[in-house]
Design a protein with these regions (language model features):
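Post-HExxH zinc-binding segment in Zn-dependent metallohydrolases
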Residues: 93-120
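Alpha-helical hydrophobic/aromatic positions enriched in membrane-embedded helices and signal peptides
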Residues: 68-72, 91
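A short, structured loop/turn motif at beta-sheet edges
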Residues: 74-76
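Intrinsically disordered, low-complexity segments enriched in small/polar residues
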Residues: 18-20, 55-56, 116-117
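Non-catalytic terminal regions of proteins
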Residues: 1-44
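Active-site scaffold of zinc-dependent metalloenzymes
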Residues: 26-69, 81-85
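Catalytic Zn2+-binding segment of zinc metalloproteases
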Residues: 78-95
Length: 120
């Protein structure tokens, strides 16, 4: 079976990042309350809990297929994911405090790129 979900650990934040590529609802059975992507959706980002093998909180980014992993979509979903993770940690971000979101969004984008290039 071809892998469709990859897990990443940001180390300094108490949440995981999961990247799904063409993952179906069945592939995501270990996650809590996840629905199929709508037909018109290219990618989405969702704060979520994984229930098996142990309970973990984090963010799931799903792409319909490898071709949908474009610069535009990676940037868009990376910012959503970084905002979700920082919000969970109580980190406030604004014009005078841009570094946390910039670094975290960059890390998320790098994780997505590794999935796209098959480097994980």
């Amino acid at each position: 079976m071809k892998k469709k979900i990859w897990e990443f650990d940001p180390q300094i934040y108490p949440q995981k990042l999961w990247i799904g590529l063409g993952a179906t609802k069945e592939d995501l059975a270990d996650f809590e309350d996840i629905a199929e992507m709508e037909d018109s959706t290219i990618a989405d980002t969702t704060p979520i809990r994984k229930l098996k093998p142990k309970k973990l909180g984090g963010v799931l980014i799903r792409f319909r297929n490898r071709l949908d992993i474009s610069f535009e979509n990676v940037t868009h979903e990376s910012v959503h994911a970084a905002m979700c993770m920082l919000d969970y940690c109580g980190v406030k971000f604004h014009a005078d405090n841009q570094e946390p979101i910039a670094y975290l969004a960059g890390w998320v984008a790098d994780c997505i790129d590794k999935v796209k290039r098959g480097k994980v």
